[in-house]
Amino acid sequence: MDTAAREALSVIWKWMKLDMPVEKADCIVGFGCINDDIAIRSAELYREGYAPRILFSGGLGRNTKSRWSCSEAERYRDIALELGVPEDVILIENRSTNTGENILFSREILSAEGLADKRLLCVHKPFMERRVWAAMKNYWPEADFTMTSPRLSMEEYIEHTMAQGMTEKAVIDVIVGDVQRMEIYAEKGFQIPQPLPELVRAAFEKMVELGYTGELIG
């Protein structure tokens, strides 16, 4: 990644990441994807006493279905167990294939456990914080929740995800594609609107100009 790309991507990263205060909750919800740091961060939050339960949500999505044989949620559970989280505090949602399904299917499980009206601490990738927040407000507007993510810089996140089998360009393509999805998904009713600031729009257009188009829709 050259200097121009790094500068533009940094603008996108800072806007997509909400940096909400981490508060104690009744359940941690770890959203599945290719990056294992979400499971590690969820286990860390549990061990630090932020919540007594963890729900891992994720079947196989567009970046994991060709790489893994087990669901994202089951992979995350195994990581959490290795990190000392007791198995009996972990809930599994392993049917979802996208963020909307993550939320809807997780809500079903949490309802059955008497946790749907409790405080939730949602964990996803740093650049997914804003998109998950907007999707939660759409699919589950009454939810009491905050967003957090693994404590990684942009460069660390890219490095960690590359270590799990993606190229640098593929990782960046996903981040750029999610900026486009902020508008398209709001138009489709998948999340509440999050208008792009002009600086972010210019950064997105710069990344497209530089060829980071692999995850764009259309």
Report each predicted region and the residues it spans:
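A structural signal for short, hydrophobic/glycine-enriched beta-strand patches
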Residues: M1-V171, L216
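A conserved mid-domain beta-alpha-beta active-site/ligand-binding segment of alpha/beta enzyme cores
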Residues: T161-G218
